[in-house]
């Protein structure tokens, strides 16, 4: 009889070393960004103070931390922006319009046809993508 070890071997090249638990965004204020992302993702705000907010999703969390001298990322410049979200949606234009109503800004330069680039209220870029592209 062979015993199977349920704990992944961290030395294996096929085993994950970690799992994504949360992504944290920097902002000058937590509440507006927490409310924005709560509406966009449909995730509840589990914690909200002036210094920090956390939204909880089905398997991940989104944190928002106060950085007093936070500067908005510049897109599409390669400067401060380090990553962006790609969100799959069924109706690009309708969801983009709703995001704008919630405080997002549609960027002027739109590099693709199956996605729309916006910035959240703190300036973080994110893309709405056609859900059909994700299978």
Which residues are covered by each model-predicted region?
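Generic alpha-helix initiation/capping and coil-helix boundary signal
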Residues: 20-21, 92
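Short hydrophobic/aromatic beta-strand micro-patches
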Residues: 24-26, 86-88
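Vicinal oxygen chelate
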Residues: 2-20, 35, 41-86, 97-121, ...
